[in-house]
Swiss-Prot record:
Protein name: GTP-dependent dephospho-CoA kinase
MF terms in GO: GTP binding; kinase activity
InterPro entries cross-referenced by the UniProt entry: GTP-dep_dephospho-CoA_kin
Family the entry assigns: Belongs to the GTP-dependent DPCK family.
Coiled-coil segments on the chain, per record: none
Highest taxon of source: Archaea
Enzymatic reactions: 3'-dephospho-CoA + GTP = GDP + CoA + H(+)
Native organism taxonomy: Archaea, Thermoproteota, Thermoprotei, Desulfurococcales, Desulfurococcaceae
Pathway info: Cofactor biosynthesis; coenzyme A biosynthesis
Species of the source: Desulfurococcus amylolyticus (strain DSM 18924 / JCM 16383 / VKM B-2413 / 1221n) (Desulfurococcus kamchatkensis)
Function: Catalyzes the GTP-dependent phosphorylation of the 3'-hydroxyl group of dephosphocoenzyme A to form coenzyme A (CoA).
Length: 157
């Protein structure tokens, strides 16, 4: 069934600037996976599995491919189309006590609302490089949000 999802959409020309690490980049000496870092929340399946965090935001995909990272529990389920922050996802950042947020769609940009609303220190994967721990200022996050464009995305659910 097709659903209209209200979103804030990342403009194509904005993608390049957000592909640059937005915090401290950690790389393992052998260019393998990085393990054991601490943050308030993790965005991404592999990162969520390999680090100590209070909240996990996952979509069962890594590099756009389905991945099995073991049994997952979901306190909150949100719909978030690729390259967007859905209003549903933004609202989920306000829910206190959730330890696991499962995303139908893509979780990559959800670093933004969780940093803005909760001031979280967030860890996320930097593809083929390592992991980033980010705790940007409220001003930086608001600047990014101002660059997003309101839209409606039709998604088959």
């Amino acid at each position: 069934m097709n659903k209209a999802i209200p979103v804030l959409k990342l403009p194509v020309d904005f993608r390049l600037s957000l592909s640059i690490p937005q915090g401290d980049l950690y790389v393992s000496p052998d260019r393998g996976l990085v393990y054991g870092l601490r943050a308030d929340a993790a965005v991404g399946d592999i990162v969520s599995k390999n680090h100590m965090v209070e909240m996990r935001i996952t979509d069962a995909k890594t590099k756009r491919h389905t991945v099995d990272v073991g049994p997952g529990e979901c306190d909150v389920l949100v719909v978030n189309p690729q390259g967007t922050i859905s209003i549903n996802s933004f609202t989920s950042s306000l829910i206190g006590g959730a330890r696991s947020i499962c995303v139908v769609g893509e979780e990559d940009l959800l670093v933004i609302p969780f940093t803005l609303v909760r001031g979280f220190k967030i860890i996320y994967g930097q593809p083929d490089v390592g992991v980033v721990i980010s705790s940007p200022s409220r001003e930086r996050v608001l600047k990014i949000l101002k660059g997003l464009k309101p839209d409606i995305v039709i998604m088959n659910l």
